[in-house]
Amino acid sequence: MPNIKFRASRRTLTSHAGLSIIGQCFEIAGVDSIDSRFPTTLGMRTSDVIKSYLGLLCLGMSDYDAVENFRRDKPFQQLLTLQKVPSAATLRQRLEKLAANDLQARTATWSTTLLSLIEAPITAETTHVCLDIDTFVMDNSNSKKEGVSRTYQKVDGYTPIAAYLGNEGWCLGLELRPGKQHTMKESNAFLERVLPRAQCLTKQPILLREDSGFDSQAHLALLEQQRQVFADEGRRLDYVVKWNPRGSATADRDTWLAVAADYWEELRPGKRQALWTQTVSIHDDNKTEYVVQRVMRLVERTADRDGQLLLEPDYELEGWWTSLDEAPEAVIKRYQAHATHEQFHSEIKTDLDLERLPSGKFATNDLILHLAQLAYNILRLMGQLGMTGELSPVRHPAKRRRLRTVLQELVHRAALVIHKARQIIPRLRAGHRTHDGVEHLAKPPALSTRNAMLTVNRRHSIHKQFQATRDRQICRAWRVERHDKTGRQHRSARWVLAITGLRKPTCTGRMIKKCSLAVIGKVSAPASRIQVIVTTSFFLWLSVWRFCQRPCSTKSFIFLPSTSFFSA
């Protein structure tokens, strides 16, 4: 046995090298923009509190006390670009205060912004991109937390609702609900919030899949209305919702048998089924009539799979509301894939350690679930971009990696953190297969582009020295455009940015009102390394909003020297 000795080192070491990728995802999602909406006069910034807890979630930790282990961890602070790491008490108090101020409404756009800018892969199933919506149970038994009550699984806890897009399972909505709340309650409002997010991420037809808990005439009427809205925009929306037979199915058995008489087909000795499609009229709250179709399946068993004869036939009646113009077998097969989302529920509860929520207040736990939505998507993104295809670890091939696998292979990876030339370089062990995946994640297409589009907060003033006449605006913008086309630098065009896209600006002295501005231009470093610097002499707030490859236009410009407020 080798003689092993432990020694302390003054070098900066970390066992969570994957935080470097997670920190970049925070910047792209725009988490730092929360400081302007929730400013603080004393204490640490709001973004530091949020990113600290998001970092814990991305490490598979959810309790407040876990942050105490990272208060003196410099890599945790540096890789997540934190000024300070809060204590457990501060983290709890600030999250409760932010939840009372409805921070949940601000966090909804973070995931869609991240997925759209990174151009996350969204795989369709046959002809449609599936959007799965369902509730699940979080067991919080033996606790007195606010909102904990009896769930449909006969345990005390919560029943949150979630929405997942594509075969990858991108989470577009995750909201907390009391345990006793019915699935259908407030689901229409949730659907109206989720559908626009799905529209922003994919142009393909969307197939909404829901179980029998969403079977109501008001919900089906809303789906028909949303289909019309999609059609007016040149888009397509379809749905498959499991039918809830309730008590009428057994009472009208003779009627169903009479309808199925023409559709029977034998599957095996002692078992046969009938498949058919029927149209049903439904009404919304305003008594508006909608005609929808329903796929029906009636199964009759006179013997079990082992050949044992039954004393009397056993009947099973099922149905699916759908807008698909397909055969009944194809509709049923599409719905059967809906069960995959149960894996996503399990990952949220186990891999993110959110089965038992840490707070006793309902609003705070709801905020934690909203933050978990972003953490889930970040880890899912790391798995899709860094652990599939040729970058897959030595395991079975898969189209999607579990979050725990991402934590083990990419996040919990030891590294030596080096500071050099104003850069933070996590150095991994050479030759390890994980190194290729991490290096690929650090340079995805959206991060390595050299064109950056930014938005300007129009409520802040612009200093006089940065205003220009129209002639100078066009001249400076022409230099930027020429540099984009030829690659040659004209009077240090390497360090210039131009604000484009003015829509009816009204200039009054130092203020520019009623306008929408966007900054586009060349930078000499990857867009992920652009840092915003706000000074007292220049009250212009910029935030990285989008990356694009479009050349500058010369219609209406305001020229700004980028060296005044950027460092790359």
Regions found by a protein language model. Name each.
Residues 1-156, 162-182, 187-201, 229, ...:
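Dynamic "connector" segments at or just before major functional cores
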Residues 2-4, 8-11, 232-350, 440-451, ...:
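An anionic, glycine-rich sequence signature occurring as long contiguous blocks
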Residues 52-53, 67, 85-87, 91, ...:
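Short, conserved catalytic/metal-binding motifs centered on acidic residues
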Residues 64, 89, 467, 473, ...:
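Charged/polar low-complexity intrinsically disordered segments
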Residues 67, 328-367, 371, 375-382:
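Short amphipathic alpha-helical "interface-anchor" segments enriched in bulky aromatics
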Residues 181-248:
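Domain-level cores of phosphate- or acyl-group-handling catalytic modules
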Residues 378-411:
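Conserved nucleotidyltransferase catalytic core and NTase-mimicking acidic/glycine-rich helix/loop elements
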Residues 488-495, 503-510, 515-516, 524, ...:
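Low-acidity, Ser/Thr- and Arg-rich intrinsically disordered low-complexity segments
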